[in-house]
A protein has these predicted regions:
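Conserved N-terminal beta1-alpha1 strand-loop-helix module at the mouth
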Residues: 1-71, 76, 86-89
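A short alpha-helix capping/helix-coil boundary motif
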Residues: 7-10, 37-38, 98-102, 120-125
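A short acidic, helix-capping loop that chelates divalent metal ions and anchors anionic groups
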Residues: 12-17, 101-107
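Short Gly/charged-rich anion-binding patches and loops
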Residues: 27, 80, 120, 138
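Catalytic beta/alpha-barrel core
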Residues: 40-49, 70-78, 92-98, 105-115, ...
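Surface-exposed amphipathic alpha-helices with a cationic face
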Residues: 57-64, 119-129
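Glycine-rich, aromatic-flanked loop segments that form ligand/cofactor-binding clefts
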Residues: 81, 86, 93
Length: 138
């Protein structure tokens, strides 16, 4: 069965552009779940212009308070990203090859070119019992 995971990054961008906690990401995620989402996705970028790494434990706590709701963290596997994901222990991590200055994710991994790098990164997440998904180019 197909499941819906809602990416709440644009709400984080709006919050950050206002310089306040409005909209509150925890409230947004709670409403998504209330209206039928089976997962919440966040993509913290190195510059934290959307989701912030400090959002991860807050959303994780919310997701863990619901049965059958998953948490997916997506992003480029930098050292900080890997560490934050392993500490948060989401259900899934989606690896995206976007450079730190990219406005949005516009292409996927070239698995042949990045084979060894991806194997090493995937192994780290799998050893921490985190399911891995890759954003790939056809």
């Amino acid at each position: 069965m197909t499941k819906l995971s809602v990416n709440i990054n644009k709400f984080a961008l709006l919050r950050n552009s206002r310089g306040t906690n409005h909209p509150d990401l925890v409230e947004v995620a709670e409403k998504c779940v209330k209206f039928g989402a089976q997962g919440i996705t966040l993509h913290p970028r190195p510059d934290e212009r959307h989701a912030k790494f400090s959002d991860l434990p807050l959303i994780s706590k919310l997701v863990n308070s619901h049965s059958k709701i998953e948490f997916n963290i997506e992003g480029y596997p930098s050292e900080r990203f890997i560490s934050e994901v392993i500490n948060t222990k989401p259900d899934q991590v989606t690896l995206v090859p976007d450079p730190p200055d990219a406005l949005t994710s516009s292409f996927g991994w070239n698995c042949k070119e990045h084979n060894m790098f991806l194997k090493e990164v995937v192994k780290q997440f799998q050893s921490n019992k985190i399911r891995v998904s890759l954003f790939v180019s056809p």
